[in-house]
Amino acid sequence: MIGRLNHVAIAVPDLEAASAQYANALGAKVGAPQDEPDHGVTVVFIELPNTKIELLEPLGEASPIKAFLEKNPAGGIHHVCYEVADILAARDHLKAEGARVLGDGNPKTGAHGKPVLFLHPKD
């Protein structure tokens, strides 16, 4: 069921500074910031040869990333994204195995126009 690693998402307190660090110090290809209001974040994708890193900064006071950064002021890994062939079948299988799907359980549209779901971090 699990496919390739799509990206590792890192919450950061300063998106501009983190982007500059990846571009200048590490020579990475850093994309332009894009607001994702449905998810309460501004994101920047960093292209790597085998996957991507997604930097996340809060967008608005209700952002889940704002709450994450309040608990982890320096930032840190927020989630790992895997690709699956059928997101609804994967959701149903994981729920049957006891995983908790966050939100209303239905996919939202992610940063690249693909459907996404989030599982509880302890699952």
Give a label for each model feature.
Residues 1-19, 75-84:
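N-terminal beta-strand motif that seeds the catalytic metal site of vicinal oxygen chelate
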Residues 17, 35-39:
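Short glycine/proline-centered loop/turn elements that form peptide/ligand docking sites
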Residues 18-23, 94:
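Conserved active-site tyrosine of GNAT-family acetyltransferases
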Residues 31-32, 62-67, 103:
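A short, acidic/glycine-rich surface segment
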Residues 55-80:
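Helix-adjacent hinge/juxtasegments
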